[in-house]
Amino acid sequence: MSILALVEDRPTPKEVYNWRIYLLAAVASFTSCMIGYDSAFIGTTLALGSFREEFEFTTMEPAAVNRVSANIVSCYQAGAFFGAFFAYPIGHFWGRKWGLLSAAAIFTLGAGLMLGANGDRGLGLIYGGRVLAGIGVGAGSNITPIYISELAPPSIRGHLVGVYELGWQIGGLVGFWINYGVSETLAPSHKQWIIPFAVQLIPSGLLLIGAVFLRESPRWLFSSDRREEAIENLCWIRQLPADHIYMIEEIGAIDQALEEQRSTIGLGFWKPFKAAGTNKKVMYRLFLGSMLFFWQNGSGINAINYYSPTVFKSIGLRGTNTGMFSTGIFGVVKTVVTFIWLLYLIDRMGRRLLLLVGAAGASVCLWIVGAYIKIANPAKNGNGEMTGGGIAAMFFFYLYTVFYTPSWNGTPWVMNSEMFEPNMRSLAQACAAASNWLWNFLISRFTPQMFDKMGYGVWFFFASLMLCSIVIVFFLIPETKGIPLESMDALFETKPIWRAHGIVLAKLREDEEQFRQDIEESGYTKSGEQRLESVQPKEA
């Protein structure tokens, strides 16, 4: 019998839950602040009268304005798609830390480029800067969840990867409110719209500085044959000595997982590509990871993020500032609910139940909002006042946000950071992040045209996709809460899917008890001089 993985409820020293692990996760999550801010500020910036006047939107036909706006928004997602794959070789050869530094540097360059745009130079610098910024956030969206999941103890892995999602929402909150602030306090001018673009430099600058002081992922160091440095980093992160039994168990599990990979996939740069192309189990899991992001974007959330003025106008709100204020409230709701998700839900309710409940609740709300728009046709309400039905529709819109945010907003990122064995994780996360940006690109590119052509049908479209996601999650997605990264193969191979979590955890508890019994029988004693090796218990 050999060492298997760690289980969520094994005896865990209190030292493991320390400030260092949260600080590392928080610094890495400045990546998501960049993403959140960029996703939120651009839609309301394009709606500012000063921006539209300087770039002559006011002289264009509505269809042309929709097309240019969609291009400005979507070139960022196009860059992010390629950035997600660009991060794979950096993360593989140079590590997670250098990957984060590279992402921050590229994003900062792109954000700086955008500041050179004006009416005389045209939109070229904004297009180019947003492509570069997209490459940076695409790379960051690949590396950050991997980095955090590789540092985290199983029992708080969802918690820590959730810090990434929290950073996204904090960045989004600032992005949603900043244009309301400049529109209320500054006269229409170049300065009014350039300030939101300049604020992009704050999270990227903080990441650029903070990443210098990050500790490299111990799991990446083990896979790169830098064992002593890996043990040193792991001991620093866990605040435990190398000869502590908790450390011996964890390092033994990592050693065993790497040995299994050597004998199956292999540890080289191209090995995961070969495995992805020839191993049906890996292909299937890549498909599931991509589908999680398909259904996430199928919720309609990014249509709201990027085109909130258009969305609120369809419900009946009038006035640029009113739409921006409502967008800001949307950001507040998302951020508050994300705190609840992070602190109470993700590692208590688990991933699977959150997805199921969130999809059901969000779908009902979207059906109601769509039905109101179909019946009342608020877009033709010329007096600009909200009716009782409109207020109810706004309530269900915000209720949709309450259902969506703690379920589909961050959970796909958490699950994709968990689903793959260590040597597949970089490539798998690259594919997952790229798929997110691909679906994101399609939504951002065609949302204006969808609202123009489909009207209330857009709400029914997204509501229908949410219903379909319930079936997919129930039959295909297992619960990953508390399952060690090294045991994901066993989880996905266990049937039926809806019982796999309990079956695998029971087996892990049994193996953990046997391992500790073998340790005691081997005469292990805690000694600072004992050389740390992968422990091999006696055969049963």
From Swiss-Prot:
One GO biological process term: quinate metabolic process
Whether Transmembrane counts among this entry's keywords is yes
Region annotated Disordered, chain positions: 519-540
| Job description of the protein | Integral membrane transporter that imports quinic acid to be catabolized as a carbon source.
Record's keyword terms, sorted = Cell membrane, Membrane, Quinate metabolism, Transmembrane, Transmembrane helix, Transport, Ubl conjugation
Per the record, what ranges lie on the membrane's Extracellular side?
Answer: 44-74, 119-130, 179-193, 307-325, 374-387, 478-540
Task: State the similarity comment.
Answer: Belongs to the major facilitator superfamily. Sugar transporter (TC 2.A.1.1) family.
What is the recorded post-translational modification? Answer: Ubiquitinated. Deubiquitinated by creB, probably to control its activity or amount.
Q: State which ranges are Cytoplasmic (membrane side).
A: 1-22, 96-97, 152-157, 215-285, 347-352, 409-456
Task: State the membrane topology.
Answer: Multi-pass membrane protein
This protein's assembly is summarised as: Interacts with creB.
Composition bias (Basic and acidic residues) maps to 528-540
Q: List where in the cell it is found.
A: Cell membrane
Gene Ontology CC terms: plasma membrane
- Sequence intervals crossing the membrane: 23-43, 75-95, 98-118, 131-151, 158-178, 194-214, 286-306, 326-346, 353-373, 388-408, 457-477
From the broadest rank down, the organism's phylogenetic lineage runs: Eukaryota, Fungi, Dikarya, Ascomycota, Pezizomycotina
Q: Which SUPFAM superfamilies match?
A: MFS general substrate transporter
Pfam families associated with the record: Sugar_tr
User: In the record, what terms sit under GO molecular function?
Assistant: carbohydrate:proton symporter activity
Instruction: Quote the protein name from its UniProt record.
Output: Probable quinate permease
